[in-house]
Design a protein with these regions (language model features):
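Glycine-rich phosphate-binding loops that contact phosphosugars or nucleotide phosphates
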Residues: 1-130, 140, 206-212, 219-228
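Conserved active-site and cofactor/substrate-binding residues in soluble primary-metabolism enzymes
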Residues: 8, 12, 99, 103, ...
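Structural motif
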Residues: 45-47, 148-150, 201-205
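Glycine-rich, charge-decorated loop segments at or immediately adjacent to ligand/cofactor-binding or catalytic sites
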Residues: 78-86, 185-191, 242-243, 247
Length: 261
């Protein structure tokens, strides 16, 4: 999947689902560079919800030359409708970012299900129904001059959506990171606020501790930050499948941003 705009978190949610389902990876690429292994026989999905149709066309042409079967989700697909041999869906105009992410996520689930990779439709329906029964905690306002948002690698879409929302709605720089890989060392490197960017606000989207190695590493990392006086906002995203936690995180992110603007 290729996406370079505000809907990238929807693509990353599909990647999280695919990893969990063990059907085979469905990676998300956030720029127009095409990996060398992408070629004949590969299904490629382009998500171009923004208005840069030239970029979508160039990427489409490059993938087609390589022999890929290209599926397109875009704001203007009319120029490609008579050329693509894959699915094509037009994103309605006038959607805000939350609506656009939801639309693209649902569309991607339909495309992935129709490919026969795994039942993404049912996974989305079940996850949405489960999260709808939650009693989510009201979060405090986000504080900081720049915000780093971290989640574990199984819910990458969660931290990316938070970072995108903060940049869009609050208007301050924000970045996302994945734990417990290299970003564990990065986060510990932020531990002393007197030395490393006192204006940095850190948000950790924490799944319910389950005794796994990632959970243990995240716990120790938070202890190090606390011992060194670095304030961290810990957001409980509960348990359940990666998609459930991704959706729950996105809802909590919307609430946190509203309290901060």
């Amino acid at each position: 999947m290729f996406c370079m705009d505000r809907c990238v978190s929807a693509c990353m949610a599909i990647s999280d689902m695919a990893d969990f389902s063990e059907s085979g990876p469905i990676p998300t690429f956030c720029d127009s560079r095409i990996p060398g292994w992408v070629g004949s026989g590969v299904d490629a999905i382009i998500v171009s919800e923004g208005r840069d149709s030239d970029a979508a066309r160039a990427l489409y042409d490059a993938l087609s030359v390589r022999g890929c079967r290209v599926h397109l989700i875009a704001s203007n697909v009319s120029m490609l409708a008579n050329r693509t041999d894959g699915a094509y869906v037009e994103v309605p105009s006038g959607l805000d970012s939350t609506e656009a992410v939801a639309f693209v996520l649902g569309t991607l689930c339909a495309i992935v299900s129709d490919m026969g990779l795994f039942d993404a439709r049912s996974a989305l329906r079940d996850s949405a129904s489960s999260v709808a029964q939650d009693r989510l905690e009201v979060l405090e306002a986000i504080d900081g001059e720049i915000i780093g948002v971290y989640s574990t690698t199984d819910v990458r879409a969660a931290s990316r959506r938070w970072a995108d929302l903060i940049k869009e709605k609050i208007g301050i720089p924000s970045f996302s990171g994945e734990l417990p890989e290299f970003d564990h060392n990065e986060l510990v490197g932020w531990s002393d606020p007197n030395v490393h960017s006192p204006g940095l606000g850190i948000v950790v989207l924490r799944s319910c501790p389950d005794g796994s190695m990632p959970s243990i590493i995240v716990g120790h990392m938070l202890e190090v930050l606390e011992e060194n006086g670095r304030a961290v906002t810990i957001v409980d995203i509960g348990s359940g499948t990666p998609l459930e936690r991704d959706i729950r995180s996105m809802i909590l992110g919307e609430a946190a941003v509203r309290r901060s603007v």
